[in-house]
UniProtKB/Swiss-Prot annotation:
Name this protein carries in UniProt: Small ribosomal subunit protein uS14
Keyword RNA-binding on entry: yes
Keywords, sorted A to Z: Ribonucleoprotein, Ribosomal protein, RNA-binding, rRNA-binding
Function: Binds 16S rRNA, required for the assembly of 30S particles and may also be responsible for determining the conformation of the 16S rRNA at the A site.
GO biological process: translation
GO molecular function: rRNA binding; structural constituent of ribosome
HAMAP family to which the protein is assigned, alphabetical: Ribosomal_uS14_1
Similarity remark: Belongs to the universal ribosomal protein uS14 family.
Keyword Secreted: no
GO cellular component: cytoplasm; small ribosomal subunit
Species this chain originates from: Trichodesmium erythraeum (strain IMS101)
Length: 100
């Protein structure tokens, strides 16, 4: 299980990403449309002034059950270990052990 502080930090980052997503998107659109170099530089500065943790690339996918950051499967939102345990117990509908 991941440290609770790390899990809480990720939750805080997700909230910041949601909060600034619209503003970041608008600034990027303006940046792409801008033709003047000075205008582009100013828009770039405005983007840089946004909180660092409001960038979507700062968010790490974590298992919602254990908080494990590695071995994460997006389809389930779980780590590989939890998927294996839950599949063996029959808690994931439609998931069967492969055999060939």
């Amino acid at each position: 299980m991941a440290k609770k502080s790390m899990i809480e930090r990720e939750k805080k980052r997700k909230k910041l990403v949601e909060k600034y997503a619209e503003k970041r998107r608008e600034l990027k659109e303006q940046f792409m449309k801008a033709e003047d170099l000075e205008q582009k530089i100013e828009l770039h500065r405005q983007i840089q002034r946004l909180p660092r943790n409001s960038a979507p690339s700062r968010v790490r996918n974590r298992c919602w059950l254990t908080g494990r950051p590695r071995g994460f499967y997006r389809d389930f939102g779980l780590s590989r270990n939890v998927i294996r345990e839950m599949a063996h117990e029959g808690l994931l509908p439609g998931v069967v052990k492969s055999s060939w």
